[in-house]
């Protein structure tokens, strides 16, 4: 089963302009250098944004262990915690096959999304990604994590809940059929 990952490089809204520009241009060496400078700032907010930018730089290079470490430092340093950050942390953990940690990040992100939703669809301002689409991705990946952990009952339950919400997802339909054999 594939991991859903629809995330696009974000603008890293509050990071150093040159780091963001380098990241968007695909100049990861320069982006990394700029964001590392930002992590050394005495201002915790700037430092946290530096770690977030560094995490995105590693993520874009598919260096998931380094990305996850940088995301953790960003959270520990006080970056504004968003559903997107927890989604990316979950994806990084999945890519490194740490499904227990991935499940924790995904569930934290989903809980955050539930408290953030005010009944109307909100746009994720960091990269224009619709929050509803990201939540769908996280719910899908939650099923994957349970499956990888061989927690068949929770995988079946979450797949069933997912299909009620997203009945058009044929990949999950096939997955639910597979899970019924477990």
Where are each of the predicted segments found?
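Start-of-helix register in tetratricopeptide repeats
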Residues: 13-14, 47-49, 83-84, 130, ...
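Conserved small/polar residues in nucleotide/adenosyl-binding loops
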Residues: 1-5
